Swiss-Prot record:
Gene Ontology BP terms: prolyl-tRNA aminoacylation
Gene Ontology cellular component list: cytosol
Keywords for the protein's UniProt record, in alphabetical order: Aminoacyl-tRNA synthetase, ATP-binding, Cytoplasm, Ligase, Nucleotide-binding, Protein biosynthesis
Pfam families xref list: HGTP_anticodon, tRNA-synt_2b, tRNA_edit
Principal subcellular localization: cytoplasm
Protein's name according to its UniProt entry: Proline--tRNA ligase
InterPro entries registered for this protein in UniProt: aa-tRNA-synt_IIb, aa-tRNA-synth_II, aa-tRNA-synth_II/BPL/LPL, Anticodon-bd, Anticodon-bd_dom_sf, Pro-tRNA-ligase_IIa, Pro-tRNA-synth_IIa_bac-type, Pro-tRNA-Synthase_IIa_type1
Organism name: Francisella tularensis subsp. tularensis (strain WY96-3418)
PANTHER family: MITOCHONDRIAL RIBOSOME PROTEIN L39/PROLYL-TRNA LIGASE FAMILY MEMBER, PROLINE--TRNA LIGASE
Amino acid sequence: MKATQTLIATTKELPKEAVLISHQYMLKAGLIKKLASGIYTWMPLGLKVLQKIQNIVRDEMNKAGASELLLPSILPSELLQETHRWDKFGPELLKLHDRHNRDFCYGPTHEEPIVDMARDTIKSYKQLPLNLYQIQTKFRDEIRPRFGVMRAREFIMKDAYSFHENSQCLRNTYNTMYATYCNILDKIGLAYRPVKADTGAIGGDNSHEFQVLANAGEDIICYSNGSDYAANIELATYAKPDLSKRVNSQNTIEKIHTPNIKTIEKLCKEMSFDIKKTIKTMVIKDAGGNFFALVIRGDHELNETKINKLDQIIAPYTLATKEEIFSIFNANPGSLGIYNCPISIIADYSAIAITDLVCGANEDDYHFTNVNWDRDVTNYQIADIRNVVTGDISPDGKGTLELTNGIEVGHIFELEDVYSKPMNANIIGQDGKSKPMLMGCYGFGVSRVMAAAIEQSHDENGIIWPESIAPYQVAILPINYNKSDKIKEVADKLYQDLLGDGIDVLLDDRGARPGVMFADADLIGYSHHVVIGDRLLEQGLIEYKNRKTQEKQEITIAELIKILK
C-alpha cells in the first residue's frame, strides 16, 4: 500500500478523557476517531490491525473444529424474555421499537438467538457436539464509557457457543477452547495468563478468564511463583494456616482507652500495635435481613464474591448502616469487636490464626488486647472471606502468591443448561429420552485485545505492535521521494520486490519532511523502518530500524531482505 492511497490521520490533539496510553495512541495514530460517547470509527490503519486479529482468531477457531456463522445484531424482545434477561440486563440493554411498535434490542451478547437457532435445527445427540462462532459488533449502553475501545459501548467480539449431550462432552470442548485461546494469544504475541474466574451474570459452572498482563489493567490477578496456579482475585484463595499450632496464651484480656481512634491504621500508629495482630470487624446484612460480623486481619480486605457464595449468606449482601450497627452493638463502626459479639461471627482463617489479638471493645473509644479464640470467643464460623495478598502460600502448597494487573480479553464458561433449559432447547439423547442440550460459551474481545496490546507494549514515541498484528510489517521511508529520481526508483523497486515476496509493506510517498515521516512511523508502530536517503544510497546502503529494539543498521538491500524473511 502507498501512503497516498490510504488515510494516515495522525494528530497531536487529544481529548481530556483520553487517560490510558492505548486510548491516546489510537487517537494520535489515527487508528480510531470518536463519533459519539463510547462509539468509534475504525480508520483504515486501525481496521487493518483489527482484521489481522480477526484472521488469527478465525484461523485458530477453524482449526479447533468450530464453524462460523453470523447472527443478527438486532434481537426481538421475546427471546430475552424467555430467559428473563430483558429486564435483568437493566439500562445497559439498548432497546428500540420498529414501526409496528414491536420491541427489539441491540445484542449485548447472543446466547438467546443461538439457542433459538439450535432448538429449531438440532434434534438428536447424533448432531452433537457442535461448536458455532461469530465475529460480531455488540452494544452495551455503559453509563460511563471510558478508556477508548477498552470499555466502549459498541465493540467487536468473537463469541462461540458449543452444544453437547453430556457434561464430559462439554468439558472436552471447554478444554479445546482453553487451548485455542492460548494459541490465539501466543500467535498474536502477547504476555498473558489464563486464570480461574467467577461466572458472573452469564451463569454456569466452570469459568476461566484470559488476562493480558499490563499495568493499566483494571483486574487484579494472582499467580503462584512455584506452580501453574492462577486466578482472578475474586476467586483466588490461599493455603490455610494450621490452626492446631496456635499457642495457648496465658495473657489476660485488657481493656484500653483509645479516644477518637476509628481506623486500624491510626490504632497501630498511636498505640504501636503490629497490624498483623489486629482484626477488623465489619457488619453486613444479607438479602434475608440477617446480620453477620465478618472478621479479617487488620491488613486484609474483604472479598465480596467469596462472601456472596457462602452458604450462610443469602446473596446479595450489603454493608450495615451506621444506625443499624449502633442499634445492635450500642457502639459505632471503628469500635466493634468479637468479644461478647451479639451477632453471628464469620471469621477468615488468617484472623483465626492470631493469638493475643487486638479488637474493638463494642464500646466507643475502647479496644481489647490479648483476646483469644476458643478461650474468649467460642461461637464463630470459619471461612475464606478475604482477598489474597502477595506472599500468601499458594493453595497447592507450591510457592507463594504474587499479584499483577491484567486486562481481560477472553472469558470461557461451562453454561450447562442455564439457557437451553428455560428455552426448551431439547434433544433426544442416546437413551431415547428428551433432555436439554448442555452448552459452553466462549467470548473473545477482538477490539479490546488491540488496546491491550498497546498497553502492554509501547514507548514514549508510540506503539510497539507484536509483528503479527502491526498495520504494516515494513514501512519504506524515502527522503525527498518526490524530488529525487534515484530515491524514487530505488524505493519503488524495493516496494514492488517486498510485495512480490508477500511482505505487508507501506511506501510513504507523501513527500513529507523526514521528521514527520519518522515520527509517524514510530507512533503508528510499523515493525520495520527502511530509510532511503542520498548519502547512504551513494554507498549502496539503506538505514534499517527495528521498531521494537530501536536498533539501527546501515545495510544493503540484500541484507534487509534476509532480515525481513
